[in-house]
Amino acid sequence: MDTPLRRSRRLGGLRPESPESLTSVSRTRRALVEFESNPEETREPGSPPSVQRAGLGSPERPPKTSPGSPRLQQGAGLESPQGQPEPGAASPQRQQDLHLESPQRQPEYSPESPRCQPKPSEEAPKCSQDQGVLASELAQNKEELTPGAPQHQLPPVPGSPEPYPGQQAPGPEPSQPLLELTPRAPGSPRGQHEPSKPPPAGETVTGGFGAKKRKGSSSQAPASKKLNKEELPVIPKGKPKSGRVWKDRSKKRFSQMLQDKPLRTSWQRKMKERQERKLAKDFARHLEEEKERRRQEKKQRRAENLKRRLENERKAEVVQVIRNPAKLKRAKKKQLRSIEKRDTLALLQKQPPQQPAAKI
């Protein structure tokens, strides 16, 4: 049987406390008796004892902690167990806690245990010291726990959904709080490390950071809603009577709109536009007058040309005075058509006519 040797290896790194710790053996016995009387408080009915003994043959290793929060695992003792211990990786202090929880291994940690007897020089005070610390913590945790506080809660595992505030997370087994493996100074009291505080009665334990975040978000949510309601009042828009729902109600009709000053023209601009209109009218009238003048000039020139032509023709006429009327009687009709009568008074005045003139 090499079990005492393993226990001596595991407990080799711890320093013995002052001899005052030997007086706590009686308190350890009382705590162990109380723990034996009701072992169902810290263990579920369906949990087998073989799970609790999983770390008996494991060598001495530091406890596995998550990379983000080493203190969170130590403070999660009574609030929520971390799950079943991994075989071969559990710390020696946790193995002692598991031995205390199982009723089959409880006689090994009593003061009369044969495993503490092979080396009484160094290991006897160490065993009693560890048992005294565990017993004091068990008694303190039992006093702090209230009947209404649930004991089986799991912390929020990364990757698993967080339980709701009214929902209890299932847990396989409760576990005792993890102890610090660093050796304490001889003068430091036993209760120096921070024990995990259980939640108050009537509250369910959820993830610490998740609960804080939810509380902060719930406190900020109503404030933002109030601000939104105050800033943006909702005014429902009804359907217009005309049925033209695409028209904007903020726009007014053209008859109701007032003209701005930029729409009114200045006096200088008005006078300039009036002058431009007057010039255009004058130019148009001038063009009409020119056209009429040219027409009149052309008409007058035509009349003058006609008059001049008539005068030229009259000057070019050959006048023959027929003094014998019988000659006219003998003339043919064709010749008579070409004969025209002229007033020869002027000619007669120059030359006194003896006979009426006749143009042949």
UniProtKB/Swiss-Prot annotation:
Name this polypeptide is given: Coiled-coil domain-containing protein 86
Entries under PANTHER family matching the protein: COILED-COIL DOMAIN-CONTAINING PROTEIN 86
Residue ranges the record marks as coiled coil: 272-323
Post-translational modifications reported in the UniProt record: Citrullinated by PADI4.
Biased composition annotated in UniProt, kind: Basic and acidic residues: 273-295, 302-313
Gene: CCDC86
Keywords of this entry: Chromosome, Citrullination, Coiled coil, Host-virus interaction, Nucleus, Phosphoprotein
Gene Ontology MF term list: RNA binding
Residues found modified as Citrulline: 342
Biased composition (Low complexity): 345-360
Record PTM Phosphothreonine, positions in chain: 65
Domain of life: Eukaryota
A GO CC annotation given for this chain: nucleus
Chain's role: Required for proper chromosome segregation during mitosis and error-free mitotic progression.
Quaternary context: (Microbial infection) Interacts with hepatitis C virus (HCV) protein NS5A.
Intracellular or extracellular location(s): Nucleus; Chromosome; Nucleus, Nucleolus
Pro residues bias (residue ranges): 153-164
Modified residues (Phosphoserine): 18, 21, 24, 47, 50, 58, 66, 69, 80, 91, 102, 110, 113, 128, 188, 217-218
Pfam families referenced in this protein's UniProt entry, alphabetically: Cgr1
Skewed-composition ranges (Basic residues): 1-12, 238-254
Chain positions covered by the region annotation Disordered: 1-313, 328-360
